[in-house]
A protein has these predicted regions:
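Residue-level recognition of alpha-helical structural elements
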Residues: 3-6, 34, 38, 79-83, ...
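Acidic/histidine-rich alpha-helical segments that form the ligand environment
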Residues: 75-112, 119-138
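Amphipathic alpha-helical packing segments from all-alpha helical-bundle domains
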Residues: 17-24
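Short, contiguous alpha-helical
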Residues: 11-12, 22, 30-72, 112-156
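Extreme N-terminal tail/first-helix region
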Residues: 1-13
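Short, flexible helix-adjacent loops and helix caps
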Residues: 26-33, 103-106
């Protein structure tokens, strides 16, 4: 097994997630992006997904754990083009973070997180990937609800 096989796989999964968020934005009519169903809007779920990735990648590379909430507000990222631009910034942060991980052994190291409890890098990355993918799934479900497809065929 190569020294960076796991790191590369994690990097690819985060890259796929960001790319799927771009595809999702491009597939949604502009009037639906911030339309609110009984839950959170499509755009807000997409941005929460990307923000989770941005926060962890910023924490890993420059120990900046700020919540991207302020610069991911609907007023700031008000259309698909601005959201795509933000995803490019998140993708750049992802690349920097994964370039900083030297090999698979580095994933077993502990990192300091805002909660004060150190955690293993691998666990932090996996938790973030799960959280970001969950928000992506919520965005997809909201698209189905708003487009009238309902929840038939959903696997719960």
């Amino acid at each position: 097994m190569a020294k960076t096989e796991i790191v590369n796989q994690l990097d690819q999964e985060f890259g796929r997630l960001i790319e799927s968020l771009r595809d999702l934005i491009n597939s949604v009519p502009p009037d639906l992006l911030y339309r609110n169903p009984p839950a959170v809007s499509i755009a807000e779920n997409i941005l929460r997904s990307a923000a989770a990735v941005e926060q962890v990648c910023g924490g890993i590379t420059v120990n900046l754990w700020d919540d991207p909430f302020e610069w991911t507000l609907p007023e700031t990222l008000s259309n698909a083009a601005l959201m795509i631009e933000y995803l490019s910034e998140v993708d750049l942060a992802r690349r920097r973070a994964f370039n900083a991980i030297s090999d698979d052994e580095a994933l077993s190291k502990y990192v300091s997180v805002p909660s004060g409890e150190p955690c293993r890098l691998a666990g932090l990355l996996l938790d973030t990937l799960v959280t970001a993918a969950d928000y992506r799934g919520r965005a997809l479900a909201t698209i189905k609800i708003l487009s009238g497809e309902g929840t038939q065929g959903f696997i719960i």
